[in-house]
Amino acid sequence: MITNTTERLDHVGESGFAGCVSQIQLSVLLSLLCVALLALAGRRPYVEECRGRLRQTLAALLLIGILAIAVFYPVTSFGEAEDIDLEMLWFPSLLTGHVVLTVFLLLWWRLRGDVSLAAFLHLSGRGLWEKLRRGVITGCSGWVLTVMVTGAAAGAMAATGRVAEPEAVPPIMVWLANLPVLYKLIIVAAAMTVEEAFFRGFLQPRVGLVLSSIFFALSHFSYGLPFMIVGVFTISLMIGRTFARTGDLLPCIVAHGVFDGVQLLIILPWAVRMWGTAVA
């Protein structure tokens, strides 16, 4: 769930303005480098999909901008979600990032101008029930695999003695766990549709399964939870493989919804309660 990249930008105080500017600059530089390396590898979607120099230039700038905002800014602000003033946090601001992604997708689609929106998003009405079934199976099995992989990673790190036991649940996670069910459903709905449209429907066909999954994991860096990143990368690979097999975004949307729904509605509240009981 991309819930706090733009939220942090809204809550930067005057004392942290210079640091924020440097983070933004670094994010743009990383994005420029990434797009340049992709171009050297022959991946230039702004050239291949857009007609005319002006449209190609605008598309390239859009790509650099969205990668800077959605992927690399969270990397440069690793762990800063803990610094958000939760008392001042306005719920609709959590969806700002999804609005930005939506605007990007619509602008890119308009710059192309040669394909329907449904085709651009890899959506069709054929085999609806089979896609829904596949999505539910992928989401459920993805949870099992993610728990196994994350547990194995945590166990391996614990064996080395390099992982300090956390003293408390991150405040942002407690805040999310205590949200009303309706708000949680809104977050899930935004994440399952917009994030899948961007990372799977847009990025994966253009940069590949592995790199789009890496980008998806990087977009969650601001939470400052390394094992969460492992889990996000794992489920992204699994959902991405489903997209590669079906060529349709709907199973991915359903799988993402199942995964985030279980996480927000069941696992996270349970984990917060269990941690509170253990500490008490």
Show the residue positions of the predicted features.
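N-terminal, membrane-interfacial amphipathic/helix-forming hydrophobic leader that caps
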Residues: M1-E130, G155, G261-A280
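Extended, compositionally biased low-complexity polar/Lys-Gly-rich tracts
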Residues: V100-F104, V136, S141, L185, ...
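"…centered on the first transmembrane helix and the immediately adjacent amphipathic helix/loop
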Residues: D114-I172
